[in-house]
């Protein structure tokens, strides 16, 4: 059987009891290591779980999944995923491949950023579509996130923006030359995300959001050093030092907010007076 085991958001202790039992009895254990990362090293996981772990990078999962699924009809294979197993479409694809081979699949869920972001003080049922922000290049600036944010904003809902990470990625030059040389890991920050959002707004000029739109920067959600900073998008462009190391996420507030959300989020505000002024003028409105 193939087990997809969620690891939670932070460290080795976030795994569930059921998940740990699966890991301990599995014949092979893989750790998916490119859609997200834990805040501890692989060696810490291996020590806590009492098992050796094979890191499954993008190339293995997307192009060599037969190795992961090898003999899973007759033995248990554990595929570990940071957060919840179905937080990325890659994992759905792995399940479909297993089904084609008539391999039974079982999921062990866990907390993910989709639920953990509630710790910022915004009510989860006031969130709309989640969007992703990738690193822009000089020639590639995908903006599909903008239209989804627009849809959320039209009905007053918050938007969770998941920011890019680059782990074991090749440069275009190395890919073109067929060289297996990988770039150093890169993790997008809240500041970079906010800047790119404002860049696309400047290009599109549809008024979906603005420099003074309220947002929350989140770092290491669920971890011991969890951190939130609230302010305008313009303010969040310069709060990376305060937020600290990865992983980061950003939430753009919708206008249909609740007073309880204001009371909770206000404690994280960079400038409380400015936050209150914008909130009272633009937010808490029923659309």
UniProtKB/Swiss-Prot annotation:
Pathway: Protein modification; peptidyl-diphthamide biosynthesis
MF GO annotations: diphthine methyl ester synthase activity
Compartments, as annotated in UniProt: Cytoplasm
One Pfam family it belongs to: TP_methylase
First-tier enzyme category under EC: transferase
UniProtKB keywords: Cytoplasm, Methyltransferase, S-adenosyl-L-methionine, Transferase
Keyword match Mitochondrion: no
Binding positions (S-adenosyl-L-methionine): 9, 84, 87, 112-113, 163, 221, 248
GO BP terms, alphabetized: methylation; protein histidyl modification to diphthamide
Catalytic activity of the protein: 2-[(3S)-amino-3-carboxypropyl]-L-histidyl-[translation elongation factor 2] + 4 S-adenosyl-L-methionine = diphthine methyl ester-[translation elongation factor 2] + 4 S-adenosyl-L-homocysteine + 3 H(+)
InterPro entries reported for this sequence: 4pyrrol_Mease, 4pyrrol_Methylase_sf, 4pyrrole_Mease_sub1, 4pyrrole_Mease_sub2, Dphthn_synthase
Gene Ontology CC annotation, any one: cytoplasm
Main location: cytoplasm
SUPFAM superfamilies, sorted: Tetrapyrrole methylase
EC number: 2.1.1.314
Protein family: Belongs to the diphthine synthase family.
Function summary: S-adenosyl-L-methionine-dependent methyltransferase that catalyzes four methylations of the modified target histidine residue in translation elongation factor 2 (EF-2), to form an intermediate called diphthine methyl ester. The four successive methylation reactions represent the second step of diphthamide biosynthesis.
HAMAP family registered for this protein in UniProt: Diphthine_synth (MF_01084)
Record's protein name: Diphthine methyl ester synthase
Organism of this sequence: Gibberella zeae (strain ATCC MYA-4620 / CBS 123657 / FGSC 9075 / NRRL 31084 / PH-1)
